[in-house]
C-alpha cells in the first residue's frame, strides 16, 4: 500500500510583497503555484522580527527560518541573545571572551577581532564588535586589531564604507582598536570549499600579503573605483609606513564575532585546524574564540555562546513515533534542512534519510538560475515512488540564492524553474494521496531593487511568506491568519494524526 506522505516544500527566499516593482516573484510566470494557490487553502506567515526570535523589524534568514520551522516554537536567535547580554552587562563577564583578553594582556600579545562588518544581523552585528572593543578597553588592552569582512549581501552592496566609518568613529570614542585588514565575504566567508578564495583572506590576516592600502576607507574606495562592491573586495592589508598594521601571530588571541556557523567554519579551520588540507599554510597557534559553536569537531577553540538544546523538534518527534523521513536539498541549503531544521544537531534522527544534490559550480548563480532544482526534483520523485517516507522536508534554494545576485531577470528565471518542479512534485504527492505544504523561510526575490536608490537589492526582506495546504482533504477548508513559521510543525503533526508535543508552543493553523 502506498504511504500518504506529508511533505513540506520550502521555497527559499520566496516572500510576498504588494509592490510589483522589482518583484521577481510577481513577475515570474508560475502557472503551477497559481493553480494550487487558487484551488487550496492558503495564508501568510510572519518570517521576521520577534515572530522568529529576532529583534523587532530584523529581516529573517535561512538559518533562523529553518530553526523555527523545525522546532515548532520561537527560537531566540544568537543575535537577540548576545545583544540582550551586552545591554544587561553579562556579555562583559563571558568566560571565553574574558579569558582570551586576559591571556593577551598577560602575554603582551595582540587581540584580533575578525568578522562581518555590518548591521545585517544574519551572520554578525556591528554592535557585537563594539561590545568587544568596550571589553578590550575595560581590560586595558592596547594592541587590538580588527579584520573586517565586508558584507554587501545582507545589506546594500556598497554600504561598506559607511560601516568602516562607523567602526572607526566607535574605536576613536572607545579609545582602542585599529583596522588591520579588510576582505569581501566572497573570500573570507566561503562555505563551498573554494579554498583559493579563503587562502587570499587568510594570507592578508596571517601573512600581511595581498592588496595594500594606507587606510580601510582608501581600500574600499579603490574597490568601488574598480567596480567591486563590498562582497567582492579583494583581501587588503592596511599598512603604516610600508608595514602591515598587524597580522595574526603565534600566541595572539583571536575572537571571531560572527554568530552564524556555516560561513565561519572554513576560515576558522584555516587558522586553527591541525589537520587542515585546504591549501598550504603554516599552522598558527593562537587562543581562538568562536562567538558560537561553529563545528563540534573543532576542539582547539573556545566558544563564547554554546548552543541551547531543543527537545522534540519536528524531526526528533516524528522519529520517536517510528516513522520514516527524508530531507532533500542541494548543497547551498542542505545544512538548513538537516542541521538547522533539527535544532542545530548534526546527527540524523533514526530513520531519517538525507539526499544531497550538488549545487552547480558557477561563480554566481545568476549564470545558472535553475541551479540544481531539476536534479533535486528527479531524485525526490524517485524517492516518492519508493513509498517509504511518512514525512519529507524539501528546500528549493533558487529564489534566495539567485535573489542574492541582485539580477532580476535571473531571479524571475529561477522562480519559473522552481514552479515547473513544484508542479511535478505536487502532482506526485496528490497521486499518492499525500499532503503538500508549501512555504518559505524568509523573503528575498520579491524585492530585487532598493526603492530608495533604484539600485539592485541583494538582501533578505521582512515580508511575510506564503503557506499553502495542498491535499484532497484540504479542498473547501481554510487556514488561520496571523501565523508564524513556528506554527508549521504543529500543523503538519495534526495532519499526520499525531499529538503535538508540549515543547512545541506554535499553533496548529487548520481551521476546525
Swiss-Prot record:
InterPro entries, A to Z: Alkaline_phosphatase_core_sf, BPG-indep_PGM_N, Metalloenzyme, PGAM_B_sf, Pgm_bpd_ind
EC number: 5.4.2.12
Positions of substrate binding: 123, 153-154, 185, 191, 260-263, 333
One Gene Ontology molecular-function label: manganese ion binding
Binding site for Mn(2+) 1: 400, 404, 460
GO cellular component: cytosol
Cofactor(s) recorded in Swiss-Prot or TrEMBL: Mn(2+)
Active site (UniProt): 62
Catalytic reaction equation(s): (2R)-2-phosphoglycerate = (2R)-3-phosphoglycerate
Role summary: Catalyzes the interconversion of 2-phosphoglycerate and 3-phosphoglycerate.
Oligomeric form and interacting partners: Monomer.
UniProt record similarity statement: Belongs to the BPG-independent phosphoglycerate mutase family.
Listed name of the protein: 2,3-bisphosphoglycerate-independent phosphoglycerate mutase
Organism expressing this protein natively: Clostridium perfringens (strain 13 / Type A)
Organism placement in taxonomy: Bacteria, Bacillati, Bacillota, Clostridia, Eubacteriales
Amino acid at each position: 500500500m502506498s504511504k500518504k506522505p506529508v511533505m513540506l516544500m520550502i521555497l527559499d527566499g520566496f516572500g510576498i510583497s504588494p509592490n510589483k516593482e522589482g518583484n521577481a516573484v510577481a513577475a515570474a510566470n508560475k502557472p503551477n503555484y497559481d493553480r494550487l494557490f487558487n484551488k487550496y487553502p492558503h495564508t501568510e506567515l510572519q518570517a521576521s522580527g520577534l515572530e522568529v526570535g529576532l529583534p523587532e523589524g530584523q529581516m529573517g534568514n535561512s538559518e533562523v527560518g529553518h530553526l523555527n520551522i523545525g522546532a515548532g516554537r520561537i527560537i531566540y536567535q544568537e543575535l537577540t541573545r548576545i545583544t540582550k547580554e551586552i545591554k544587561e552587562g553579562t556579555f562583559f563577564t563571558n568566560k571565553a571572551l574574558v579569558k582570551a583578553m586576559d591571556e593577551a594582556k598577560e602575554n603582551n600579545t595582540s587581540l584580533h577581532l575578525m568578522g562581518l562588518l555590518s548591521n545585517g544581523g544574519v551572520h554578525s552585528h556591528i554592535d557585537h564588535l563594539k561590545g568587544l572593543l568596550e571589553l578590550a578597553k575595560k581590560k586595558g588592552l592596547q594592541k587590538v586589531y580588527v579584520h573586517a569582512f565586508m558584507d554587501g549581501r545582507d545589506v546594500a552592496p556598497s554600504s561598506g564604507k559607511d560601516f568602516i566609518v562607523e567602526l572607526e568613529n566607535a574605536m576613536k570614542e572607545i579609545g582602542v582598536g585599529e583596522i588591520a585588514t579588510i576582505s569581501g565575504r566572497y573570500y573570507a566567508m566561503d562555505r563551498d570549499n573554494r579554498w583559493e578564495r579563503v587562502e587570499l583572506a587568510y594570507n592578508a590576516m596571517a601573512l600581511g600579503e595581498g592588496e595594500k592600502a594606507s587606510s580601510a576607507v582608501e581600500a574600499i574606495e579603490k574597490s568601488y573605483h574598480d567596480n567591486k562592491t563590498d562582497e567582492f573586495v579583494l583581501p587588503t592589508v592596511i599598512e603604516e609606513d610600508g608595514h602591515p598594521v598587524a597580522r595574526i601571530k603565534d600566541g595572539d588571541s583571536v575572537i571571531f564575532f560572527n554568530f552564524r556557523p556555516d560561513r565561519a567554519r572554513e576560515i576558522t579551520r584555516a587558522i586553527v585546524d591541525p589537520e587542515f588540507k585546504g591549501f598550504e599554510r603554516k599552522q598558527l597557534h593562537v587562543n581562538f574564540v568562536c562567538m558560537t559553536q561553529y563545528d563540534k569537531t573543532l576542539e582547539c577553540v573556545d566558544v563564547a555562546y554554546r548552543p541551547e538544546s531543543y527537545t522534540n523538534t519536528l524531526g526528533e518527534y516524528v522519529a520517536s513515533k517510528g516513522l520514516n523521513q527524508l530531507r532533500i536539498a542541494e548543497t547551498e541549503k542542505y545544512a538548513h534542512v538537516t542541521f538547522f531544521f533539527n535544532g542545530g544537531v548534526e546527527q540524523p534522527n533514526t530513520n531519517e534519510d538525507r539526499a544531497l544534490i550538488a549545487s552547480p559550480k558557477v561563480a554566481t548563480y545568476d549564470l545558472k538560475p535553475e541551479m540544481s532544482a531539476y536534479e533535486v526534483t528527479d531524485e525526490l520523485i524517485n524517492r516518492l515512488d519508493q513509498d517509504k517516507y511518512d514525512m519529507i522536508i524539501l528546500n528549493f534554494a533558487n529564489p534566495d540564492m539567485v535573489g542574492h545576485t541582485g539580477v532580476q531577470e535571473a531571479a524571475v528565471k529561477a522562480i519559473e524553474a522552481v514552479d515547473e518542479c513544484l508542479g511535478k512534485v505536487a502532482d506526485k504527492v496528490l497521486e499518492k494521496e499525500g499532503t503538500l505544504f508549501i512555504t518559505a523561510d524568509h523573503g528575498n526575490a520579491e524585492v530585487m531593487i532598493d526603492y530608495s536608490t533604484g539600485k539592485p537589492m541583494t538582501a533578505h526582506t521582512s515580508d511575510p511568506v506564503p503557506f499553502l495546504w495542498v491535499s484532497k482533504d484540504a479542498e473547501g477548508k481554510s487556514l488561520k491568519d496571523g501565523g508564524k513559521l513556528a506554527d508549521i510543525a504543529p500543523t503538519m503533526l495534526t495532519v499526520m494524526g499525531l499529538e503535538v508535543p508540549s515543547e512545541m508552543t506554535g499553533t496548529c493553523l487548520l481551521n476546525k
